[in-house]
Regions:
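N-terminal membrane-anchoring/stem segments of glycan-assembly enzymes
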Residues: 1-39
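Membrane-embedded multi-pass helical conduit in multi-pass membrane proteins
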Residues: 3, 39, 245-319
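Short aromatic/hydrophobic "clamp" motif used to bind/position activated sugar donors
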Residues: 91
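Catalytic donor/gating beta->alpha subdomain of glycosyltransferases that bind UDP-sugars
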Residues: 112-115, 121, 125-136, 175, ...
Length: 319
């Protein structure tokens, strides 16, 4: 009986990461979902530059250089005050750092022709090309868009219908994610626009400290949206794409420990534990190699770094 219980727990610990990274995208790929209309009429827009570091001078110039008719531009650290004082029908939020594509504003507002759409998320990319993990996340967002339930947004570019803009509580760490979850909870559709692009000026792998900071923001959101865990509007995406990922570090740790305990019940469990150990050691040993082999192991290293950043992230969410 003990072996059966441990084996079930071991299986569940491996299944949950498999579900969130493999089965969940497969379910999203099923041929169903919503179709959204696009319009050619350009609504009034207020561009709000409120994320990242900078005085706003360069970004204001690049935004106004898009030539969007009647554009209002606001530079402010206070997102609530900026939104409240804006006159645009559509509020477009931007950061200071990324480069804005000249057609981004025109493209991102097209989907607001469909009255179901309350928020549109733009695409952040790099002119040097994005990594495999980021391409995977972008693909998942595109599939989520079919259901009007894109989970999260890039601070570099997203837009919200003014009458759907919620108030952001103080000390929220991940404002774009909070807004996407809150708007979905309120009944609005959140969709993805791959033609509304921003470009990273610097490419590179985020530091572990940055990943921990991001994880802290997600843990905070976990406490802000408890109702989204229980079969509410958007729960399928919120749990499948986000919540299960936040616990992958725990799943992998539990799988290793349950496997270790199962070694007392037969050689097959010893082999499985050895395979786990070889996998982790190989990731750290071979991810520094150049070429295709090293590239594959760097993807796994990135996966482990992102997953285990949620452990220390639990303890800094309110700092």
């Amino acid at each position: 009986m003990t072996e059966i219980v441990l084996a079930v727990l071991f299986g569940v610990s491996l299944f949950l990461p498999f579900y969130t990274y493999v089965l969940y995208p497969l379910l999203l790929s099923l041929p169903r979902g919503k179709k959204y209309s696009e319009g050619d009429v350009l609504p009034s827009v207020t561009a709000i530059v409120c994320f990242g570091e900078g005085d706003g001078t360069a970004k204001r110039a690049s935004v106004e250089a898009t030539g969007y008719p009647g554009l209002e531009t606001v530079v402010s650290r206070d997102i609530n005050a900026a939104a409240a004082s804006s006159s645009g029908e559509i509020l477009v939020f931007l950061d200071h750092e990324t480069e804005l594509d000249p057609d981004a504003l025109r493209n991102i507002v097209k989907l607001f022709a469909d009255k179901r759409v309350a928020m549109v998320v733009g695409e952040q990319t790099s002119r040097e090309g994005s990594g495999a993990f980021w391409k995977y996340e972008t693909k998942v967002r595109r599939m989520e868009s079919k259901f009007g339930s894109v989970s999260g947004a890039n601070a570099s570019l997203f837009a919200i219908r003014r009458d759907a803009m919620p108030t952001v509580p103080e000390k929220v760490r991940n404002v774009p994610f909070y807004l996407s979850a809150k708007i979905k909870q309120n009944g609005g559709d959140v969709v993805y626009c791959p033609d509304a692009k921003t470009y990273e000026k610097k490419s590179g792998t985020p530091t572990f400290r940055k990943r921990v900071s991001d994880a802290a923001g997600y843990w905070q959101a976990f406490g802000l949206f408890p109702g989204m865990l229980f079969f509410r509007r958007g729960s399928f995406v919120y749990v499948g794409h986000r919540v299960l990922k936040w616990f992958v570090w725990l799943d992998l740790t539990a799988a290793f420990l349950f496997n270790a305990a199962l070694c007392f019940f037969g050689w097959i469990w010893i082999v499985l534990l050895a395979l786990q150990a070889v996998f982790y050691l190989s990731v750290f040993a071979f991810s520094r190699l150049k070429g295709g082999v090293g590239g594959i192991f760097r993807v796994f290293r990135y996966f482990l770094a992102v997953s285990f950043a949620f452990l220390p992230g639990m303890f800094v969410q309110n700092q």
